[in-house]
């Protein structure tokens, strides 16, 4: 019997693609859904983690392609900065360092804590509890966010506003991403919440979250890709490919929707959803 069926792979892949950009915890949903549907999938099993590697790589690739023109500008801005050609007004150069500073602590803490956190909190009950916590955090961020937002000079200057964040704020947001290793806590929710508290608008915070997530998710996926290609990936490579395709499609749709959604809307509905879904799962699992 296959450890993951192709139908399950499509559903889990599509769910990963949707829930990674949304501030609702992709890892939490990957733990909760199989339990709710009665699937015989062990979340701590090597084959399941290998499957998730494929879907995360697909998500990171789509994020890179979606923001490819932005990444080109950021890359050339970074090159100007190390060659000493960047000016204080060079938005792309400063944005590059904002992303680098936010990525480093996330990577270090992720490598140090990933196995321990996932082992401690990978149970469906723990994931439901932390999903509820995630919801309350989103609601609290909207309540206590900094107002007015960081000013800009007009339309289309979101990168300029993001680049005006302090390096200390970027470092703190990057370190806080380690919380997303706990199933139920959302990486995009943490980064967007940090951006809002730093004074960004919802739209700019979402954009910053997507840019910051790309190297973090991509690096984590590449580091674990040998597991999928090695013996631990035996029996799930076909399902992983199907799941990755599903994740790629839904990631693109989710990012496109959210960038438009956050032009005029807030995090609150996602906070309410997380609280309701988390409490519902806790009740179901306790019966």
What kind of region is each of these model predictions?
Residues 1-287:
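Multi-pass membrane proteins that catalyze or facilitate reactions on polyprenyl-/lipid-phosphate substrates
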